[in-house]
Structure formats: C-alpha cells, structure tokens
Design a protein with these regions (language model features):
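Histidine-rich, glycine-flanked metal-binding segment
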Residues: 1-54, 449
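Divalent metal-coordination and catalytic microenvironments
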Residues: 9, 29, 49, 60, ...
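Acidic, glycine-enriched loop/beta-strand segments at the rims
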Residues: 11-23, 330-334, 397-408, 416-457
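Metal-associated gating/positioning segment near the N- to mid-region
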Residues: 38-42, 46-101
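Short, acidic/polar
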Residues: 64-70, 150-159, 216
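Divalent metal-dependent hydrolysis catalytic cores, especially in the metallo-beta-lactamase
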Residues: 70-91, 103-114, 162-176, 195-206, ...
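Active-site neighborhoods of metal-dependent hydrolases
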Residues: 116-177, 221-225, 230, 234-403
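C-terminal cap of metal-dependent C-N hydrolases
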Residues: 341-349, 354-374, 439-485
C-alpha cells in the first residue's frame, strides 16, 4: 500500500514530456509510480481538474526563515536556496537551519563576501543580506583589492566552505566592486577544480561606460572561458538595466562557444537590495541607472529619497536597511516591457525570485511564526508571487510559451543548473519514479499572484496542495501550521 496517492490530476513532467491525466503514488517521501488507476493508499489527494507538477525550485531566496518559506509555499516553491550571497561558516548555517526546522527544502552557497569581511575587517556578522549590509560600515572589504596574503586567506575560507557542502560560490560582486580580477580568477579556478558553480551579481550596474553592465558581463564571460568555471548570472533582468538585449547577445554567443554560463530572472521591473550598496552612492548614479534618487524607496518606511544627500545620510544611519529600486516601468513603457521579456524568456534561463526577508515597521527582520504574517510585514512582491506571476502573466495570459515549457523554467531548468555539482538535485524538478515527492497541485485558471507594492504580504492563490518530501505543507488551499518537512540540499562534504 502506498503512503499517499495524488489522484486524477493533469500530471506534467517537463523532463519526460508527460502531460496527461494520471495518479502519482508516493512512498517514504519518494515518487514510486505514475500511471492511471494506481492501487490503494493510506491517504489520497483528489486532483481532478488540477495540474500536478514538480515543486518549484528557487535558486535565489534570501529569506531563509519560516515566514519566508510559508509565503513561498503559496507561490508553489518546495526548495528555496540562498546562492547569490551565500553563507559562512557553511556547516554552522546548515546546523542552525536543521535545529530551527524549515518548511521548505533549503541550501546555500559558500559566501565569498563573508570570507572577504572576515579576512579584511575585524567585524563579526551573520550570514544574511542584512548582515552583509551592516558590514558595509567598513568600506575596505567593499572598495579595496585584497593583498596577496588576504587573497590566499579568502580562497582558503571559501575552500573550507565548499568542503562543508556549500553549493558553489556566491559572488555578490556589485557589493564589493573593489575586488581584483586576480582574486576572482583564483576563486573561479577553485570552483572549476571542485566542479561547483559560481553565482554572480555582476560587478557593475550601469547603462554607460566605464564600469557598465556590459563591461561586467564581458568580464564574467572571460572568467568562464579562462578558468573553466560555471558562471551563473543572478537576476539577469535587473543587472542588465536597459542593456539587456546586448547582454543577452553576449551570453548566447558564450553558450554557443561551449562556455558554462547560465542565467535566471524574476518577472518584475523593480529590484531590491540594502541601502548601503556602493552603487547608490556613486555621484553619477542617475546617469548610470537612468533614474532619479526617487526611484530608491526604503521598504520599512515606504519612503522615496529626494536627493543624494538624503540617501548618503540613510547609508550612514543603517546601511542594512532594505530598499526597492524602481528601474523599469513595465506597466506604461512598451520598450521596458520588451526588455523584461528578453530576460524572463531567455532560452534555458530559470525563473528565480531574489526573495528578500520580511521587515516590520520598526525596521527589524521578522522571523516569527504568526500566520498570516503581521500586517506591517513588508518585503517585495517577488517574495510572495514570483512564480505565480510568471505562470499567470507570461504563460496563461500572454501565451509566450506552453505550460510545460513554462513549468520547466521553474523546475527542471534550475535543477539541471545544479545537478552536475549537487547530486540531490537529480531527484528534484521532475515527476517520475525515484524522484523526491516535492509536488505542487494547482488550479491553473485560478493561479495568481496577489502581492503588489501597496500590499506586499498577500499570499498567492491557486495552489491547492503542496508536498515537500511527501509531507503536506498546503492542504486544500490552507497552510499546515506545524509542517516542518524541509530537508537540506548540500554538496558532498567531509
């Protein structure tokens, strides 16, 4: 007898191409069979009229907490990974997650930025986007090239993180643009040596030279070619700014030449980061981004800056404060809409949210267990609705691709980006015998994102059931409050 059978749904598996009504049988957290009219089970889910698909894999999730997991569960996510910034020490982070309990599967890369902070400053900081922001009070790790001795120490710290199971190397290069190419090349060679990807926020975000986005993309592709490293580009849509078409051309050419370069994007024209990011302080920021300072909005206060002086004061006060950056007007500008389409629909590219932590009105990060989230909890709509927005808008409404191809960008493609280095991903992102029972069951016609920039903490609708390792996280559209089935995703480690 099976533990659970999901009966009579439209089962879609992007790997095999299966798209037909069938049952999915689960035993001990693993899919055992997919066929019509499978046998008896201890429990059943009636999926008639619903889509049954692999759970979504998010390569870029900064929340890494119970409230963040819960919001992403309603977005169809079953695996949420912190790969762009990463963590350090890696082993300690995984131990902390296991002790706290997680709703979704979790994992992280080895955090190069935290290796720089530990080596080049006297600061002790937590492995989080907020911790990185607080460390920006000491500009040395941000603005200066490491000495040869420091480079050796940074490389060694990262090597230890990889040995502890870090899923590659996180390179938020834009937050430490002073890092030298010698340092970066050594780390990329290390990644190639151990067969692990790198995940890069490119060094520069600018529509104009010098230090343009295209400059940074050219350097990234050069590192892929010269070191053999797999260079994964984080949030392709935002770092390219208005030059996404040229950036896409460069990436396609690199891929045709056999270089290991992959991309991800999220379906919004507004980004988010910490206010202390050095690119905001650049006197040429308006020219480089093509926006004014009023495009930068403090998340907690919902306040837009009026001048560079006001921005600099905020950076001095709390560099870790989260902000929104409104860089594309996709609602009113058809040219901007086309740019976003180029990145979101890039062939072979993954959908990834760049979900950020939930912040309360007093500026603190919310890590509690209240459900629904507190009324004053804010983040970015992408933290709630990235995958449902993509499937609703790009797939169902605009029909830019078929449903099975749209689902592949949320499931199989991110799994394949990771699986050469992380064998656990061979069992995720697909539905078939032997695969992990990470499954989303949704009403395709009702699937929709509800979060916007006026109400960011509204959960998406349309996910009727969500299973993580065969355990229910969402049941009949409601959250299972005590569910903590999340398991670590980790490279082999000592």
């Amino acid at each position: 007898m099976y533990d659970l059978v999901v009966r009579g749904g439209r089962v879609i598996d992007p790997e095999s191409g299966h798209d037909a009504v069938a049952d999915v049988a689960i035993r001990a957290g693993t899919i055992e069979a997919i066929d019509r009219q499978l046998g008896a089970a201890k429990e059943e889910i009636d999926a008639k009229g619903l889509v049954v698909a692999p759970g979504f894999i998010d390569l870029h999730a900064h929340g890494q907490s119970i409230p963040a997991d819960r919001m992403q569960a309603f977005d169809g996510v079953t695996t949420a990974l912190e790969l762009e910034i990463g963590v350090l020490p890696v082993a300690r982070w995984y131990d902390e997650q296991a002790e706290a309990g997680r709703v979704l599967n979790y994992g992280a890369s080895t955090g190069w930025a935290f290796a720089r902070i530990a080596t080049m400053t006297s600061q002790q900081t937590e492995s989080s986007v907020e911790g990185m922001g607080r460390a920006m009070r000491d500009k040395r790790w941000v603005e200066e090239a490491a000495t040869p001795a420091e480079t050796a120490e940074i490389v060694e710290r990262v090597r230890v993180g990889l040995e502890q199971g870090g899923i590659g190397i996180g390179f938020p290069n834009a937050y430490a643009p002073g890092a030298g190419v010698k340092e970066l090349s050594e780390l990329c060679s290390l990644a190639a040596e151990v067969g692990a990807p790198t995940y890069t926020h490119i060094a520069y975000m600018s529509n104009v030279d010098p230090k343009s986005s295209i400059d940074a993309y050219t350097r990234l592709i050069g590192l892929a070619g010269s070191t053999g490293a797999h260079m994964h580009i984080c949030h392709f849509n935002s770092t390219s700014l208005l030059d996404v078409d040229r950036a896409a051309e460069l990436v396609r050419t690199a891929q045709r030449q056999g270089l290991k370069v992959t991309v991800e994007a999220y379906p919004y024209g507004t980004g988010s980061t910490v206010v202390g990011a050095t690119f905001f302080a650049d006197p040429a920021f308006p020219e480089r981004f093509g926006t004014g300072y009023d495009a930068i909005e403090l998340v907690a206060e919902r306040h837009r800056f009026g001048s560079r002086d006001e921005l600099l004061a905020a950076q001095a006060d709390d560099p870790s404060a989260l902000v929104l950056i409104h860089f594309l007007d996709v609602a009113m500008n058809e040219g901007h809409r086309s740019l976003l389409d180029t990145s979101v629909m890039f062939p072979g590219g993954a959908i990834a949210s760049d979900a950020i932590p939930w912040t309360l009105a007093d500026g603190t990060t919310y890590r509690g267990t209240a459900w629904p989230l507190p009324d004053d909890a804010v983040s970015h709509p992408r933290s709630s609705g990235t995958f449902t927005k993509y499937l609703r808008e790009w797939v169902r409404e605009r029909q830019t691709c078929s449903l099975i191809d749209g689902l592949a960008k949320c499931t199989l493609i991110p799994a394949r980006i990771l699986e050469p280095s992380t064998p656990a991903m061979l069992k995720k992102g697909r539905l078939g015998p032997g695969a992990d029972a990470d499954i989303v069951v949704f009403d395709y016609e009702a699937l929709t994102d509800r979060a916007d920039f006026h109400a960011m903490n509204r959960a998406s609708e349309g996910v009727r059931h969500l299973l993580v390792g065969g355990e229910r996280v969402i049941e009949h559209g409601g959250l299972v409050l005590d569910a903590r089935p999340g398991r670590p995703v980790r490279r082999s480690y000592r």
